[in-house]
């Protein structure tokens, strides 16, 4: 969905149709899962992203962990129908260990029985209390964001909403974890998520001397 909406690919693939763009190996298409990390590039609102798609299955967690060392930000995708699972907590601890700023996308919200409020309560309890829904209106999430920082909270009490730069700083410091809800299959909430990425990610400052890190 990210690559399709950003115009990087012209055709929207589906895992269950065995034609997902980044599932290039026959075994991946056959089993409907990602086994090997893949790379793609896309642009949204003048921000250029390099996407590293990693396995979500517990059997291939070593492949995922190797990729973490080169990430500036992470996007943790959670099934809205399943909620936080044991492997979700394992990935969360790995992201914490590596100090990687993290966005969350809660997928499959089109399925019956999914409830955003219940999921948010679970995310706050199971992962971090600084998980905040960014699928709500700005005014509704402002208080939750302000609670992540004392000075922001004081400004919020006086009527000032958190600035975009304030939010970006909290994210990179891992003091705020934006949560977006939607359905990748139906492209619901994906555009909002892309807008959030473009608004709140910051390009790290790299040394002038060339350097590289091999992750696979």
Each model region followed by its residue ranges:
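Structural and coupling elements of P-loop NTPases
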Residues: 1-216
